[in-house]
């Protein structure tokens, strides 16, 4: 029935800040963009960020969590820190495995987990 995930959409309050975080700092390539919209390829999953319009009652940053797997969490955190992205929590090593939490410019959680 379903073949694959097409995209996941989020609301952002500021497209340039979203682009800087997801493209410049995290390194995801742009699939499509215009003045009100940004789509990036996050390891095969397309993440879409758009500005809320007058009829859109979604609050930027309140609509989800992005989880990303990394081979080496400590190395990933060090690399991200060198680019100005700091973990706001962790790293932790618990029943869920080894993980840390980042936040994007809208306050959305980005969880990094070690494989």
Regions found by a protein language model. Give the residues of each.
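Conserved short beta-strand elements that form part of the metal-binding/catalytic scaffold
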Residues: 29-63, 109-114
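N-terminal beta-strand motif that seeds the catalytic metal site of vicinal oxygen chelate
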Residues: 1-17, 46, 64-66
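Short secondary-structure junctions
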Residues: 27-32, 87-91
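Conserved active-site tyrosine of GNAT-family acetyltransferases
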Residues: 18-23, 80, 107
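Mid-chain, well-packed structural core segment of small domains
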Residues: 66-77, 85
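Vicinal oxygen chelate
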Residues: 82-115
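Aromatic-flanked redox-active Cys/Sec active sites in thiol-based oxidoreductases
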Residues: 12, 42, 70
């Amino acid at each position: 029935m379903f073949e694959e995930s097409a995209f996941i959409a989020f609301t952002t309050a500021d497209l340039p800040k979203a682009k800087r975080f997801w493209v410049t700092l995290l390194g995801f390539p742009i699939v499509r963009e215009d003045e009100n919209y940004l789509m990036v390829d996050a390891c095969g999953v397309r993440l879409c960020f758009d500005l809320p319009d007058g009829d859109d009652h979604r609050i930027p940053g309140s609509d989800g969590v992005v989880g990303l797997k990394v081979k080496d969490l400590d190395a990933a955190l060090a690399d991200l820190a060198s680019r100005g992205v700091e973990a706001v929590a962790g790293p932790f090593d618990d029943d869920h495995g080894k993980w840390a939490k980042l936040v994007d410019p809208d306050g959305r959680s980005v969880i990094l987990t070690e494989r």
